[in-house]
């Protein structure tokens, strides 16, 4: 296992649309493992592959209920609205209020290549949307109503 360096705002890869994963190879499995190690090392709740310099549609999340691994995630349903503060491992020291859907349903592949549906609300819904935005080259500061130093 390895801890990746988290790339910060200003890095080109954070503004690119990430490439879909065509095949789940041992390298993708290793990426998932190392991303989870990196997430836990950084005390984060979510991490997208572009944040570690890899332009792939891969996300890992753990909001305290165990790890969730998502390959090629797509939001298929949204409900309600929630305004709350967000931060980002790629934008240290900054928080901002961002409006997000209160509930989401996401389809993605797991590391076995099986299609899974994840339903989330609260922090999980916010984290799913935030990380999927990373795959589109969108950062939370692009959507924030206001930002502040923490």
From Swiss-Prot:
* Presence of the UniProt keyword Protein biosynthesis in the record: yes
The enzyme's main class, written as a single word, is: hydrolase
Q: Keywords in UniProt for this one? A: Hydrolase, Iron, Metal-binding, Protein biosynthesis
Query: What does UniProt list as catalytic?
Result: 131
Question: Does the keyword section mention Metal-binding?
Answer: yes
One Pfam family assigned to this protein is Pep_deformylase
A GO molecular function assigned to this protein is: metal ion binding
Q: Which domain of life is it from?
A: Bacteria
Record-level GO BP terms: co-translational protein modification; translation
Co-factor binding comment: Binds 1 Fe(2+) ion.
The positions annotated for binding Fe cation are: 88, 130, 134
CDD domains hit by this protein: Pep_deformylase (cd00487)
Which InterPro entries does the UniProt entry name for this protein? Peptide_deformylase, Peptide_deformylase_sf
Q: Which cofactors, by name?
A: Fe(2+)
Reaction(s) the record says it catalyses: N-terminal N-formyl-L-methionyl-[peptide] + H2O = N-terminal L-methionyl-[peptide] + formate
Protein function: Removes the formyl group from the N-terminal Met of newly synthesized proteins. Requires at least a dipeptide for an efficient rate of reaction. N-terminal L-methionine is a prerequisite for activity but the enzyme has broad specificity at other positions.
Q: Which family does it belong to?
A: Belongs to the polypeptide deformylase family.
Q: What is this protein called?
A: Peptide deformylase
Q: Which organism is it from?
A: Desulfitobacterium hafniense (strain Y51)
Q: List the lineage, top down.
A: Bacteria, Bacillati, Bacillota, Clostridia, Eubacteriales
> Gene encoding this chain?
def
